[in-house]
Amino acid sequence: MTKFETVRGMKDYIGIDAEKIRYLESTFRDLAIKYGYSEIITPVVEEFKLFALKGGEELRETMYVFKDKADRELSLRPEITPSVARAYIQNLQSSPKPIRLFYFGTVYRYDEPQYGRYREFRQAGIEMIGDSSILADLEVLDLLYNFYDKLNLSNDITIKINNIGIFRKIMDKYNIEDNLQEHILHLIDKNKINEALDILEKNLKNKDIIDFFNKILTKKDTKLEDIESLAELEEVSRLDIKSEFLYLFRLSRILSNLNIKFKIDLGFVRGLAYYTGLIFEVLHPSVQFSIAGGGRYDKLIELYGGLPSPAIGFAIGVERTLLVIKDLKVEEPVNVIVIGMSEDTIPSMFMVSRILRKEEYKVVINTKDQPLSKLLPYYASQGFKVAIIIGKQELEKNMITVRNLITRKQISVPLENIEDAIKQTL
């Protein structure tokens, strides 16, 4: 017989593991709604070009790509931002700005599976489209920080930030084409600094600029006052990037006032090729990889054929976030097992179950044909706290027995007093 298993790099989530994912989803959804964001659900399958156009070298290499029966080249989504951008152009472009959207869904990448890296995983994220202000950037960062605060992780995480506009402006000034810019930034992202500098040297032929690149790429933990000093350098003015440093200074100063823990890393870039300004990642000391990330992508909407529209967003790695949570306690309702002692009690079993489910109890009806002496210890071992026992004699008197399966305390009460009896036995 054929034996089927999960596809490599993908996994099943059962019981408490599934509940943890749903807990993160509901926590994120509740928070995003409180910030004024509306949910968007996009297809898992999109045109390949949607992601390939500005996904970056690494993303293109790891996409699940296939042709359908109409010979269209399609892809399982490797991320969700491009889908949101496409949906915005298709459905929301004429709506009042800014547009605030949030999502939660599965994405797919053909990576080598390892700790913290899967081929199917979940992302929770937001996109704000139509606002280029520093307030928009701060709102997005504040929402991200508050999500981790709700998970009791705000004291552990650090948000790493940079302004990729510094690199973009220099390369635009010297007419380095987009594909080469993408490759250079990809090399920097992979910490292949010397390779990136070699390509820049061949194309810029300007030692001063190469030296400047080298200087900022090595500033991994830059202080606020250093940013202000860098903004005043003559070469910064000459390269027309003073405003990019001043923006980073303003943003960082406000983040400090908001008590959001962050660090400035001028050598930090992100692998996705559509970023134009602020970029950021969430770091946790227990893992070597980021658990969330995002940034500003002011040209993507126009690239997809929409009207020019600034945008910013982030995506949270759900499984990665779960890895860094030491003790996630998902609140569960009280587990109740309803046991009927004869066929005559079946209607009462269902009636009792309906009553308790309306009061948010988790209720299971016993289907095992075994004596009570075996059923009670079995259900106690399965995590049930309360047993409702309905026997023939109780049924005749409209009574039930409520038993605490942990303490073994039990009482018999009229059916209408069932809720009080459960509370009394717990």
From Swiss-Prot:
InterPro entries: aa-tRNA-synth_II, aa-tRNA-synth_II/BPL/LPL, Anticodon-bd, Anticodon-bd_dom_sf, His-tRNA-ligase, HisRS-like_core, HisRS/HisZ, HisZ. Keywords: Aminoacyl-tRNA synthetase, ATP-binding, Cytoplasm, Ligase, Nucleotide-binding, Protein biosynthesis. It catalyses: tRNA(His) + L-histidine + ATP = L-histidyl-tRNA(His) + AMP + diphosphate + H(+). GO terms for cellular component: cytoplasm. Signal peptide: none annotated. Its EC number is 6.1.1.21. It is found in: Cytoplasm. CDD domains: HisRS-like_core. GO terms for molecular function: ATP binding; histidine-tRNA ligase activity. It comes from the Archaea. The keyword Cytoplasm applies. Disulfide bonds: none annotated. Its main location: cytoplasm. Pfam families: HGTP_anticodon (PF03129), tRNA-synt_His (PF13393). GO terms for biological process: histidyl-tRNA aminoacylation; L-histidine biosynthetic process. The keyword ATP-binding applies. Belongs to the class-II aminoacyl-tRNA synthetase family. This is Histidine--tRNA ligase.
